Amino acid sequence: MANYDSNECVVCMEEKPLVVFEPCMHHNCCESCSGHVSNCPYCRADITGVYLEASVKVKLEPCEHIVKLIKITEKKCSTCDQDTTGMVIVDGKLTKTFKAENYRNAARLKNIIAMLIKAAKARNNRPGFFRKMKFGIPSVFTNYIHLDSCVICKKEIKEEVGKTYMHACCTATICKPCAKAILKAMVEKEITENLPFCPYCFTKTPIKYGLNAEGELLDPPSDSFSYYYVNEYMKMINNQ
């Protein structure tokens, strides 16, 4: 059969693997760990859905009979005894559904946060750090400078109020969810001094202007980069 079975989750090595990945149909992660992977740990295929194994019904190929996945023990249809060449999920409890691109965007945001935190801590004792960062930008960051879409998640920003950040250095716009994620990480790491560079283009230039939660144009002091926006974030979460 198409499944890759394991007696324990290949990620945490503790829980039993109770979910099935779509479309590869591999069975090697517990439900908790399945939310932290974007590719199947066994075949590296992009995951588009995660199902509870016990609930899954599949249509076998080529006979097209529908059977419960947990009842399949060999590469033969239990109804017609014909050899199976594949299977497709037709029913089951879907625990998660996503596009692989969403996970790549999340990874991109996570990398930006890590780089910002690392640079903020290293700024005082590594003078060559900024040059290395500026010229070591991954190519994935290029060609995404659009005022109507977030440069991190690439989702369209339909309302002006959603343009939380607009960087004068590169005109890049970051949507409110991505901006909040960056700020939340900075607050958790207790980094409240100026950020060392623009989160998008890595230019060593503070944000010149931005929009607050009400969509009003802001004019922070020219050297207020992180401190200003961390305070804005704290106001935002305190008002929720």
UniProtKB/Swiss-Prot annotation:
InterPro entries found in the cross-reference section: Znf_RING, Znf_RING/FYVE/PHD
Mapped zinc finger ranges (RING-type): 9-44, 150-202
SUPFAM superfamilies with a match to the protein in the record: RING/U-box (SSF57850)
Statement: the UniProt record of this protein carries the keyword Repeat: yes
Species for this entry: Ostreid herpesvirus 1 (isolate France) (OsHV-1)
SMART domains: RING (SM00184)
Protein name: Putative RING finger protein ORF96
Keyword Zinc carried by entry: yes
UniProt entry keywords in alphabetical sequence: Metal-binding, Repeat, Zinc, Zinc-finger
